[in-house]
A protein has these predicted regions:
Chain A
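Conserved ABC ATPase signature
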Residues: 135-139
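Conserved beta-strand-loop-alpha-helix hinge in the C-terminal portion
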Residues: 211-235
């Protein structure tokens, strides 16, 4: 059931990398609780994900999440939107789990003690109390994904952007992580090649060449997207 | 791969790298042996002429490569003006610009691969001492491969920091960057070993 | 053998990447680049010989025309400019830093690496740097020394970071710390 949530608004957003136009004059308002973004490699989905998280500045237009200009007001942005990247090894900064979870809380302004408390509380929520002192190095791939998720959740954002969050994991692990995600009351915006993951979503947007090719209920957009992908022959593959 | 070699074709590009380097050495030694203001002015004029032969855009690129030297030129001139020894200051400054500009000219007109060949050739006498030079050429290739990969990983980690903090990335990102770098090196070493490695020569 | 060569190449690349990190500015208004820390790390992590080789490899690439020095500088020009002394000092600094870490085998790595990084990265490197400046700018040693003193506090910070990083690497990836191998 769709519920009105904190809107993610893109107004006339364009992004250029050098001479290449990655996103063209995009205007979107995302208010569904579960939004999926599909598209081919190079379509601009990853750039869109980073825009919503406030990590890239648009060359034109504005991006706001729940009224916060996520690019210019970083202080408020980190309270509002979080992002989960594809590879935990490119995300985890600190050597122990507790430090990694506490980092975001410190950046939100909590004291060292409060941050430690918050980290432990998050670990308890997931039944991983014993992970506090553990070295991230010693954890498995799936466990590292969970650490990244907990680190983002600890900051209690209203919107979480997921950029291909399950790449490289085995099926049971994906299932378990998905269960955690689906139970969350926050808005999820997931960029994915995994169609199955997005079937249950409220709204799916298909990005093609930096523009919106289709936008609507999940089953509609996904059907159109899959049909189009069937039409693409080998010559147009990303090789 | 981004090198400093100019994409603008010059008449100097086809000249053999070894020859250009030898000329450069001779010219640099000469510059440091001459002491007169007149000689320095002449030298700079000659260098400027060399740069203008391929055209103004090329000369402008050359000027840009000289930017780091300007601050030293300014320092030297200021110093010497204050100590009432302007003439000596001008000699030093002009010698500096001529020497650096000449060296840059060689860099701008010589391909990276040709330079590597010269280096390996210069190192070849080492083989008589039992030192193998093949790994050196290989090491060069490896560094060129590592730099963009390392950069990308560093950027990802810095981005991951910025996703959770309004502040610029701090010194703490140095460790995870070093770790992913070392792990990448392990994979490369493994791939090398799988393809025969160095010990099978 | 493969691991040693790849590590040497990796650290040479690391020096380059550290040169691309944006400069910090100290309270005194002096800009510091992270590249010097890379030099120290080559010594403290790889040891004297291999650390020096890594730095020489880096310098070779700069000479060959890659813009790897902080600020995107490179090419043969930098070897005739006023900073040439520092470039000569780089591999020697790494060697000394590594030699100290190797010699102080029984001292905890953090201390040994700090001492190595400070001695290699500051007095050794600066002596060569100052000589180079004196020759190219036609100044006395003392006069050139004056020009570089503001950069020393930044280098102390870099030495501390290099030492901490070396110690962490010894814990996390002991096989890569060739200075204590």
């Amino acid at each position: 059931m769709e519920t009105a949530t904190d809107p993610v608004c893109l107004e006339g957003v364009s992004v250029r990398f050098g001479s290449r136009k990655v996103l063209r004059d995009l205007t979107l308002t995302l208010q569904s609780r579960r939004v999926g973004i599909v598209g081919r490699n190079g379509s601009g989905k990853t750039t869109l994900a980073r825009l919503i998280a406030g990590l890239i500045a648009p060359d034109a237009g504005r991006v706001t999440v729940a009224g916060v200009d996520v690019c210019t007001d970083r202080r408020a942005a980190i309270r509002t939107v979080g992002i989960l990247f594809q590879n935990p090894d490119h995300q985890i900064i600190f050597p122990t789990v507790e430090e990694e979870l506490a980092f975001g809380l410190r950046q939100l302004g909590r004291s060292k003690a409060e941050a430690r408390e918050g980290a432990r509380a998050m670990l308890a929520r997931f039944g991983r109390d014993d992970w506090a002192e553990r070295a991230v190095d010693g954890l498995s791939q799936g466990q590292r994904h969970l650490v990244c998720l907990m680190a983002v959740l600890a900051m209690e954002p209203r919107v979480i952007v997921l950029d291909e969050p399950f790449a490289g994991l085995d099926i049971p692990t994906i299932r378990a992580l998905r269960r955690y995600l689906e139970a969350l009351p926050v808005t999820l915006i997931q960029v994915s090649h995994d169609i199955a993951a997005l079937r249950e979503y409220d709204r799916v947007i298909w990005l093609e060449g930096g523009k919106v090719a289709a936008d609507g209920p999940a089953d509609e957009t996904l059907a159109r997207y899959l049909a189009a992908m069937e039409e693409v022959d080998d010559a147009d593959a990303d090789l | 791969m981004l090198t400093l070699t100019s994409e603008i074709r010059t008449p100097y590009h086809p000249i053999r790298a070894g020859a250009k380097l030898a000329l450069l050495c001779a010219a640099t030694v000469g510059l440091f042996m001459l002491g007169s203001l007149g000689a320095m002015v002449a030298a700079n004029a000659a260098v400027a002429a060399l740069y203008l032969v391929p055209g103004r855009p090329f000369a402008r690129d050359g000027l840009r490569l000289l930017k780091p030297v300007w601050i030293f030129v300014a320092l030297v001139l200021a110093w010497h003006v204050l100590t009432h020894d302007t003439r000596a200051g001008l000699v030093i400054a002009l010698r500096l610009t001529a020497a650096v500009a000449l060296a840059n000219l060689v860099t701008m007109t010589t391909r990276f691969d040709d330079m590597v060949e010269v280096v390996l050739w210069l190192l070849s006498p080492l083989r008589r001492l039992g030192i193998r030079t093949a790994p050196i050429g290989f090491a060069i290739v490896l560094v060129v491969r590592f730099i963009p990969v390392l950069l990308a990983k560093a950027r990802s980690l810095i981005e991951a920091w910025r996703a959770r903090s309004p502040r610029r990335a701090g010194w703490q990102v140095a460790l995870p960057i070093a770790l992913v770098a070392i792990d990448d090196a392990e994979h490369v070493a493994e791939a090398l070993r799988a393809r025969g490695g160095f010990d099978t020569e | 053998m493969e691991r040693q060569i790849t590590l040497i190449a990796l650290f040479a690349a690391l020096i380059a990447v550290l040169g691309l990190v944006p400069q910090f500015t100290l309270a005194s208004g002096v800009p510091i680049t992270a590249q010097g820390m890379g030099i120290m790390l080559c010594g403290t992590v790889l040891g004297a010989r291999r650390g020096a080789l890594a730095v020489l490899l880096f310098l070779a690439l700069v000479a060959l025309g890659l813009p790897l020095l902080a600020g995107g500088r490179g090419g043969l020009g930098v070897f005739v400019g006023p900073t040439v002394g520092f470039l000569v000092g780089f591999p020697i600094a790494a060697f000394v830093a590594g030699w100290i870490v190797e010699r102080m085998r029984n001292t905890p790595i953090l201390t040994a690496a700090f001492i190595g990084a400070v001695i290699g990265g500051i007095p050794v490197m600066y002596v060569f740097g100052i000589i180079g400046m004196s020759v190219t700018l036609d100044k006395t040693f003392a006069e050139s020394a004056l020009l570089v003193t503001p950069f020393i506090p930044g280098d102390l910070i870099k030495a501390g970071l290099a030492a901490a990083l070396t110690a962490s690497l010894l814990k996390a990836r002991p096989a890569s710390v060739l200075s204590r191998g």
